Swiss-Prot record:
UniProt keyword terms in alphabetical order: Cell outer membrane, Conjugation, Lipoprotein, Membrane, Palmitate, Plasmid, Signal
Domain of life: Bacteria
Function comment: Responsible for preventing unproductive conjugation between bacteria carrying like plasmids.
Descriptive protein name: TraT complement resistance protein
Protein backbone atom coordinates (compact mmCIF):
# COMPACT_ATOMS: atom_id res chain seq x y z
CA UNK A 1 0.00 0.00 0.00
CA UNK A 2 2.80 2.39 0.93
CA UNK A 3 4.56 1.65 -2.36
CA UNK A 4 1.40 2.36 -4.31
CA UNK A 5 0.92 5.70 -2.55
CA UNK A 6 4.50 6.70 -3.29
CA UNK A 7 4.06 5.81 -6.96
CA UNK A 8 0.83 7.78 -7.09
CA UNK A 9 2.53 10.84 -5.61
CA UNK A 10 5.38 10.50 -8.09
CA UNK A 11 3.00 10.25 -11.04
CA UNK A 12 0.94 13.24 -9.91
CA UNK A 13 4.12 15.28 -9.40
CA UNK A 14 5.28 14.38 -12.88
CA UNK A 15 1.87 15.33 -14.25
CA UNK A 16 2.05 18.77 -12.65
CA UNK A 17 5.55 19.29 -13.99
CA UNK A 18 4.55 18.25 -17.51
CA UNK A 19 1.39 20.33 -17.55
CA UNK A 20 3.12 23.44 -16.34
CA UNK A 21 6.27 23.22 -18.44
CA UNK A 22 4.56 24.48 -21.59
CA UNK A 23 3.28 27.61 -19.90
CA UNK A 24 6.59 28.24 -18.15
CA UNK A 25 8.57 27.80 -21.36
CA UNK A 26 6.29 30.25 -23.18
CA UNK A 27 6.54 32.82 -20.39
CA UNK A 28 10.36 32.69 -20.42
CA UNK A 29 10.91 32.67 -24.19
CA UNK A 30 8.36 35.36 -24.97
CA UNK A 31 8.83 37.72 -22.03
CA UNK A 32 10.34 40.43 -24.25
CA UNK A 33 8.56 42.13 -27.12
CA UNK A 34 9.89 40.96 -30.49
CA UNK A 35 9.13 42.93 -33.63
CA UNK A 36 9.77 41.94 -37.23
CA UNK A 37 8.90 43.74 -40.47
CA UNK A 38 9.15 42.26 -43.95
CA UNK A 39 8.47 43.66 -47.40
CA UNK A 40 7.12 41.40 -50.14
CA UNK A 41 8.94 43.16 -52.98
CA UNK A 42 11.95 45.47 -53.22
CA UNK A 43 11.29 48.90 -54.75
CA UNK A 44 14.17 50.57 -56.59
CA UNK A 45 13.81 54.30 -57.13
CA UNK A 46 16.02 56.28 -59.48
CA UNK A 47 18.45 58.67 -57.74
CA UNK A 48 17.07 62.21 -57.91
CA UNK A 49 17.88 65.63 -56.49
CA UNK A 50 14.17 66.32 -55.93
CA UNK A 51 13.17 65.63 -52.33
CA UNK A 52 9.47 66.41 -52.07
CA UNK A 53 6.94 63.79 -50.97
CA UNK A 54 3.15 63.67 -50.91
CA UNK A 55 1.60 61.25 -48.41
CA UNK A 56 -1.78 59.56 -48.62
CA UNK A 57 -2.24 57.11 -45.74
CA UNK A 58 -5.45 55.12 -45.40
CA UNK A 59 -6.68 52.66 -42.79
CA UNK A 60 -9.42 50.18 -43.65
CA UNK A 61 -8.76 47.94 -40.65
CA UNK A 62 -10.93 48.00 -37.55
CA UNK A 63 -8.16 49.49 -35.40
CA UNK A 64 -7.50 53.17 -34.69
CA UNK A 65 -4.40 54.31 -36.59
CA UNK A 66 -5.03 58.05 -36.42
CA UNK A 67 -1.39 58.82 -35.59
CA UNK A 68 0.14 56.69 -38.34
CA UNK A 69 0.41 59.40 -41.00
CA UNK A 70 2.24 61.67 -38.57
CA UNK A 71 4.77 58.94 -37.80
CA UNK A 72 5.37 58.24 -41.48
CA UNK A 73 5.76 61.97 -42.16
CA UNK A 74 8.32 62.28 -39.35
CA UNK A 75 10.26 59.28 -40.66
CA UNK A 76 10.30 60.71 -44.19
CA UNK A 77 11.47 64.11 -42.91
CA UNK A 78 14.23 62.41 -40.93
CA UNK A 79 15.56 61.08 -44.25
CA UNK A 80 15.92 64.65 -45.51
CA UNK A 81 12.71 64.91 -47.54
CA UNK A 82 10.04 67.61 -47.46
CA UNK A 83 6.43 66.52 -47.03
CA UNK A 84 4.04 68.65 -49.11
CA UNK A 85 0.25 68.81 -49.11
CA UNK A 86 -0.20 69.21 -52.86
CA UNK A 87 0.34 66.10 -55.02
CA UNK A 88 1.10 68.31 -58.02
CA UNK A 89 4.13 69.78 -56.24
CA UNK A 90 5.56 66.44 -55.08
CA UNK A 91 8.22 64.43 -56.89
CA UNK A 92 7.25 61.27 -54.99
CA UNK A 93 3.85 60.00 -53.93
CA UNK A 94 3.59 57.51 -51.10
CA UNK A 95 0.20 55.86 -50.77
CA UNK A 96 -0.44 53.23 -48.11
CA UNK A 97 -3.46 51.39 -46.77
CA UNK A 98 -3.53 49.34 -43.57
CA UNK A 99 -5.62 46.32 -44.56
CA UNK A 100 -5.53 44.45 -41.27
CA UNK A 101 -4.14 44.92 -37.78
CA UNK A 102 -5.14 42.08 -35.53
CA UNK A 103 -4.11 39.10 -33.45
CA UNK A 104 -2.99 36.28 -35.73
CA UNK A 105 -2.27 32.63 -35.04
CA UNK A 106 1.37 31.51 -35.18
CA UNK A 107 0.78 27.87 -34.21
CA UNK A 108 1.52 26.62 -37.71
CA UNK A 109 5.00 28.14 -37.64
CA UNK A 110 5.77 27.60 -33.98
CA UNK A 111 5.46 23.93 -33.02
CA UNK A 112 6.65 24.55 -29.48
CA UNK A 113 3.37 26.33 -28.72
CA UNK A 114 1.42 23.23 -29.75
CA UNK A 115 3.52 21.17 -27.36
CA UNK A 116 2.69 23.58 -24.57
CA UNK A 117 -1.04 23.10 -25.10
CA UNK A 118 -0.62 19.36 -25.22
CA UNK A 119 1.01 19.45 -21.80
CA UNK A 120 -2.23 20.13 -19.94
CA UNK A 121 -4.20 17.50 -21.85
CA UNK A 122 -1.49 14.90 -21.19
CA UNK A 123 -1.66 15.82 -17.51
CA UNK A 124 -5.39 15.14 -17.32
CA UNK A 125 -5.03 11.86 -19.22
CA UNK A 126 -2.21 10.65 -16.98
CA UNK A 127 -4.22 11.49 -13.89
CA UNK A 128 -7.22 9.54 -15.09
CA UNK A 129 -4.95 6.63 -16.05
CA UNK A 130 -3.84 6.17 -12.45
CA UNK A 131 -7.29 4.78 -11.71
CA UNK A 132 -6.54 1.63 -13.67
CA UNK A 133 -3.54 0.90 -11.45
CA UNK A 134 -5.00 1.75 -8.04
CA UNK A 135 -8.55 0.39 -8.20
CA UNK A 136 -8.90 0.33 -4.40
CA UNK A 137 -9.09 4.15 -4.26
CA UNK A 138 -10.35 4.92 -7.75
CA UNK A 139 -12.49 7.92 -6.80
CA UNK A 140 -9.82 9.72 -4.80
CA UNK A 141 -7.06 9.02 -7.30
CA UNK A 142 -9.16 10.14 -10.26
CA UNK A 143 -9.93 13.38 -8.45
CA UNK A 144 -6.26 14.05 -7.76
CA UNK A 145 -5.31 13.26 -11.35
CA UNK A 146 -7.97 15.50 -12.87
CA UNK A 147 -7.06 18.28 -10.46
CA UNK A 148 -3.45 18.04 -11.59
CA UNK A 149 -4.55 18.30 -15.21
CA UNK A 150 -6.75 21.29 -14.45
CA UNK A 151 -3.81 23.04 -12.77
CA UNK A 152 -1.86 22.67 -16.01
CA UNK A 153 -4.77 23.95 -18.06
CA UNK A 154 -5.15 26.96 -15.77
CA UNK A 155 -1.43 27.72 -16.10
CA UNK A 156 -1.65 27.52 -19.90
CA UNK A 157 -4.69 29.81 -19.88
CA UNK A 158 -2.79 32.44 -17.91
CA UNK A 159 0.20 32.36 -20.28
CA UNK A 160 -0.66 33.05 -23.92
CA UNK A 161 1.79 33.56 -26.77
CA UNK A 162 0.26 36.50 -28.61
CA UNK A 163 1.24 37.84 -32.02
CA UNK A 164 -0.24 40.95 -33.60
CA UNK A 165 0.22 41.45 -37.32
CA UNK A 166 -0.27 44.59 -39.37
CA UNK A 167 -0.63 44.16 -43.13
CA UNK A 168 -0.16 47.26 -45.29
CA UNK A 169 -0.29 47.69 -49.06
CA UNK A 170 2.06 50.41 -50.33
CA UNK A 171 2.23 52.19 -53.68
CA UNK A 172 5.00 54.64 -54.53
CA UNK A 173 5.05 56.87 -57.59
CA UNK A 174 8.02 58.85 -58.87
CA UNK A 175 8.00 61.50 -61.56
CA UNK A 176 9.87 60.89 -64.78
CA UNK A 177 10.74 62.99 -67.81
CA UNK A 178 9.48 60.27 -70.13
CA UNK A 179 5.85 59.75 -71.06
CA UNK A 180 4.38 56.76 -69.25
CA UNK A 181 1.51 54.84 -70.83
CA UNK A 182 -0.62 52.72 -68.53
CA UNK A 183 -3.18 50.14 -69.64
CA UNK A 184 -5.84 49.41 -67.04
CA UNK A 185 -7.98 46.27 -67.08
CA UNK A 186 -10.76 45.62 -64.56
CA UNK A 187 -13.19 42.69 -64.30
CA UNK A 188 -16.44 43.78 -62.63
CA UNK A 189 -18.85 41.11 -61.42
CA UNK A 190 -22.37 41.09 -62.85
CA UNK A 191 -24.51 39.00 -60.50
CA UNK A 192 -23.24 35.52 -59.70
CA UNK A 193 -22.42 34.23 -63.17
CA UNK A 194 -21.16 37.12 -65.25
CA UNK A 195 -18.51 39.80 -65.41
CA UNK A 196 -17.93 43.04 -67.24
CA UNK A 197 -14.43 43.76 -68.52
CA UNK A 198 -13.36 47.40 -68.51
CA UNK A 199 -10.20 48.60 -70.23
CA UNK A 200 -8.66 52.03 -70.38
CA UNK A 201 -5.40 53.65 -71.38
CA UNK A 202 -3.87 56.73 -69.85
CA UNK A 203 -0.64 58.64 -70.20
CA UNK A 204 1.25 60.43 -67.47
CA UNK A 205 4.68 61.19 -66.10
CA UNK A 206 4.92 58.78 -63.16
CA UNK A 207 6.32 55.31 -62.64
CA UNK A 208 4.38 53.42 -59.97
CA UNK A 209 5.55 50.54 -57.79
CA UNK A 210 3.64 48.36 -55.37
CA UNK A 211 4.64 46.22 -52.40
CA UNK A 212 3.19 44.79 -49.20
CA UNK A 213 4.62 45.38 -45.73
CA UNK A 214 3.92 42.83 -42.98
CA UNK A 215 4.85 43.81 -39.43
CA UNK A 216 4.67 41.42 -36.47
CA UNK A 217 4.79 42.07 -32.72
CA UNK A 218 5.11 38.98 -30.53
CA UNK A 219 5.12 38.65 -26.74
CA UNK A 220 3.48 36.63 -24.00
CA UNK A 221 0.09 38.09 -23.01
CA UNK A 222 0.61 40.96 -25.44
CA UNK A 223 -2.15 43.58 -25.66
CA UNK A 224 -2.81 45.56 -28.83
CA UNK A 225 -2.28 48.84 -26.96
CA UNK A 226 1.34 47.77 -26.40
CA UNK A 227 1.83 46.36 -29.91
CA UNK A 228 0.30 49.30 -31.80
CA UNK A 229 3.07 51.92 -31.37
CA UNK A 230 5.87 49.53 -32.33
CA UNK A 231 3.93 48.25 -35.33
CA UNK A 232 3.37 51.83 -36.49
CA UNK A 233 7.03 52.71 -35.91
CA UNK A 234 8.19 49.69 -37.90
CA UNK A 235 5.90 50.51 -40.81
CA UNK A 236 6.99 54.16 -40.85
CA UNK A 237 10.66 53.15 -40.81
CA UNK A 238 10.16 50.60 -43.59
CA UNK A 239 8.35 53.06 -45.86
CA UNK A 240 10.85 55.87 -45.27
CA UNK A 241 13.77 53.55 -46.02
CA UNK A 242 12.46 53.02 -49.56
CA UNK A 243 13.47 56.61 -50.37
Amino acid sequence: MKTKKLMMVALVSSTLALSGCGAMSTAIKKRNLEVKTQMSETIWLEPASERTVFLQIKNTSDKDMSGLQGKIADAVKAKGYQVVTSPDKAYYWIQANVLKADKMDLRESQGWLNRGYEGAAVGAALGAGITGYNSSSAGATLGVGLAAGLVGMAADAMVEDVNYTMITDVQIAERTKATVTTDNVAALRQGTSGAKIQTSTETGNQHKYQTRVVSNANKVNLKFEEAKPVLEDQLAKSIANIL
